[in-house]
Amino acid sequence: MAGPIITDWVHRAPPAQGLERIEAYFAGHGYDMHRHDTYAIGRTLHGVQSFQYRGGWRHSLPGTTMVLHPDEAHDGEAGTQDGFHYRMVYVEPALIQQILGGQPLPFIAGGLSADPRLFAATQTLLRNVDSPLDPLEQQDALFDLAHALNRVSGVAAPRQRFDYQAAERAREYIHSALDRTLTLDELAVHCQRDRWSLSRDFRLLFGTSPYRYLSMRRLDLVRALLVQGQPLAHAALAAGFADQSHMTRQFRQAYGLPPARWLKMLGR
């Protein structure tokens, strides 16, 4: 008897600094509850994309823009029997901060927006993934996106003070420590800040904790190594995880599916 026909697929755009672009189709269940440390911004091209987000069900239809805030849990499935086809761009909060100059991250309530300013600002970043972005074109598109998010969010900035420069130094330092144990105390010494103030500012400015940021950068490295053909165990150790099972656990928590299924959907 012939096996089931695999209809789900994911296409990835060529790598770009600070963001990832994908186009995908799911016939039914897409992925389990998970969370990214990036903005997940996209649009449904065909069908209905249903997902749980911030305590309720959301339904993305063509013509609206999805804006999932960093570190907010969500899942994904088809809202009808026709499946759903969508494009998504994952944008590092650090890129938004570099454009806005260090302020609380813009937040779109409910994760969906019908605002035409946001739809227009995402047009370039959400075009066909087979069409590469020119570097300057990408930078212009990110500028438009950051300011559209800021305008559409309509959330007043909190009055507390924060140290953007120290948080940015911590973020850069984390990139130098992917393959070893890192403590908040070490980050605080490097940035010359109190550790809890640094942790608070990091979360406010980049939308996630220092540990989560470190874990996600390790998973970025794992995915790059897997695409190159490295075995799961080797990729896990090279990226600083204790072992393959530790990496697989965190991979599933971050992306809603295990690495083996992720590779299969990429056609690897």
Segments and roles (model prediction):
Residues 117, 162-170, 206, 215-218:
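N-terminal positioning helix adjacent to the helix-turn-helix/winged-helix DNA-binding module
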Residues 3-106:
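N-terminal regulatory/effector-sensing and dimerization cores
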Residues 63-64, 198, 222, 247:
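Short hydrophobic/aromatic patches on the structural cores and recognition surfaces of FHA
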Residues 102-159, 172:
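Amphipathic alpha-helical segments enriched in hydrophobic/aromatic residues interleaved with Lys/Arg
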